[in-house]
Every structure is written in structure tokens, then in C-alpha cells.
């Protein structure tokens, strides 16, 4: 439970539909162009374009459903998530544990789970929500981050990736890795914040698919504290759907019987 509550937001938002673009029409990646990307700002702008930043401007809401598994514990469950106008709602259902929910209505954040009950998100947790729930458009990074630093090219699996350290206006730094060929985001390192403290988390994004002109990672694999593996596989992603505004608001406390 500690792991789930600490990484719930990071997993859901970082692996949510990323604002992206239509793939290049050339027969093979223009490596000569990629080689000219020498600054963090240039890479972030190029990545946003490659993943569909133009199409993302037409998106007002996104609703996603996914399967969630924690192999080491033999846990398999379901997850649903809604993002609209910088508001966020997520629900994870795990057999034997129950429902884990988290929400943000644009100002206030809250969480509810079988162990901690219903509570407000404050301090570092709330700052994390505010940072991650905003549009994931790399070209717009200056609205969410105060600093972007190019660390160089790193190997992520079999791919070569630009490593960029992004420092939010509030909260700790994150390192994002962009494939040098596709410019897609393929890994994110961050320290997730939860009710029990801070937990280092590595999230790998893959199985990108074109949805409404945007490239969306349909699979994420997260390594928590270097040992625990959490896999999320999206089964359905829909954009510009009607959203019930009430789901973002903190639930009322049920009277004790």
C-alpha cells in the first residue's frame, strides 16, 4: 500500500496521453537534424512537435482505462483516469486491497484509500499534483519548470536518449529521457511523494500509438525504490468526451453508523 499511494499520481499522470504530433513523413529518421539539437530548449520543443503539440491544442479532456499489475505481489487490477482543464481524477481497483482514489479540482487535491481514509493533499504532495496535472507539452516547459539542463545522451534499453533534468517551480527535479531518433519520451525519473514519504521511481514509456493526432504511450513500466515493478497497460483512451465535473471534487465524509 505504501508503494501504491506514493506513486499513484506519478504513474497515472506521467503515463497519461502526452501532447504530441504527427510522425515525420520521411522514410527514415532525419538523424542529421537530430544531431543539431544541442540545447535542452531545442530538444523539448522538437519533442513536443514530434509527439503532437499541434493536435493537442484541440483536446479539452481525456479519459483513459488501463490494466495494472504488480508481478512480485501477484496483484492485478484496473485503473481509470480523467484529465480536463488541469483537473485530475484517478481510481485504482485492486482485489484484496480495495479502491484507491486521487483527485484535483484545480485548487484542492485529495486522496482516499482503505488504510488512510479520505485526506487532503498538502505540501509536497499537492505541489506534485499541480506540477504533473498540467499539460504535458514539452514546448511549454517554462510554464511548469524553472530550469532545464541537458545532461547528455544516455542509453535507455537499446535506445539512445537525450537526458534532460527539469526542475519544477515547486518540488524536486525530474530527469526526462527522449529517444534521439523519434524524440518520444521513453523514461522519466522522479521522486514520488506520498503520505509515508519520498520514493524514487523510474518510469519507462513504450508502445506509442497515434490517437487523434497525438502519440500516446499505451504501456508504462515503473521501478519503485529500485526493486518493485508496476506495469500499466492502457486499453482505451478517448479525447474530448463529456466529463462529470463532480468527480474532481473531494468526496463528502460518510457519517459513521
Predicted regions and their residues:
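A short, sequence-level motif marking secondary-structure junctions
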Residues: 81-87, 105-108, 125-127, 179-182, ...
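Catalytic loop of the DD-peptidase/beta-lactamase superfamily, centered on the K-T-G motif
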Residues: 100, 107, 116-121, 224-230, ...
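N-terminal mature ectodomain segment of secretory-pathway/periplasmic proteins
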Residues: 35-36, 41-117, 145, 149-151
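Positively charged n-region of N-terminal signal peptides that target proteins for export
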Residues: 1-5, 21
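Bacterial Sec-dependent signal peptides at the C-terminal "C-region" and cleavage site
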Residues: 15-23
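Gly/Pro-enriched, hydrophobic low-complexity segments
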Residues: 20, 93-95, 160-251
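Flexible, processing/modification-adjacent segments and terminal tails
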Residues: 22-45, 49, 108-172, 180-182, ...
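Bacterial N-terminal signal peptides
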Residues: 6-15
Amino acid at each position: 500500500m505504501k508503494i501504491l499511494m506514493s506513486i499513484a499520481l506519478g504513474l497515472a499522470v506521467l503515463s497519461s496521453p502526452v501532447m504530441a504530433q504527427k510522425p515525420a513523413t520521411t522514410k527514415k529518421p532525419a538523424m542529421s537534424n537530430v544531431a543539431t539539437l544541442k540545447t535542452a530548449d531545442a530538444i523539448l520543443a522538437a519533442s513536443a512537435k514530434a509527439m503532437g503539440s499541434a493536435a493537442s491544442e484541440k483536446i479539452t479532456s481525456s479519459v483513459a482505462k488501463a490494466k495494472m499489475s504488480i508481478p512480485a505481489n501477484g496483484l492485478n487490477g484496473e485503473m481509470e483516469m480523467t484529465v480536463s482543464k488541469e483537473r485530475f481524477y484517478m481510481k485504482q481497483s485492486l482485489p484484496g486491497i480495495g479502491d484507491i482514489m486521487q483527485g484535483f479540482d484545480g485548487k484542492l487535491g485529495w486522496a482516499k484509500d482503505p488504510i488512510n481514509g479520505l485526506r487532503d493533499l498538502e505540501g509536497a504532495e499537492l505541489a506534485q499534483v499541480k506540477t504533473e496535472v498540467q499539460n504535458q507539452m514539452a514546448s511549454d516547459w517554462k510554464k511548469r519548470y524553472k530550469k532545464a539542463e541537458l545532461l547528455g545522451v544516455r542509453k535507455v534499453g537499446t535506445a539512445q536518449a537525450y537526458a534532460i533534468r527539469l526542475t519544477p517551480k515547486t518540488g524536486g527535479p525530474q530527469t526526462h529521457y527522449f529517444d534521439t531518433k523519434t524524440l518520444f519520451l521513453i523514461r522519466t525519473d522522479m521522486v514520488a511523494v506520498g503520505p509515508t514519504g519520498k520514493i524514487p521511481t523510474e518510469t519507462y514509456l513504450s508502445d506509442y500509438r497515434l490517437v487523434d493526432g497525438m502519440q500516446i504511450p499505451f504501456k508504462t513500466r515503473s521501478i519503485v525504490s529500485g526493486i518493485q515493478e508496476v506495469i500499466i497497460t492502457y486499453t482505451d483512451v478517448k479525447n474530448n468526451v463529456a466529463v462529470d465535473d463532480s468527480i474532481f471534487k473531494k468526496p463528502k465524509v460518510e457519517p459513521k453508523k
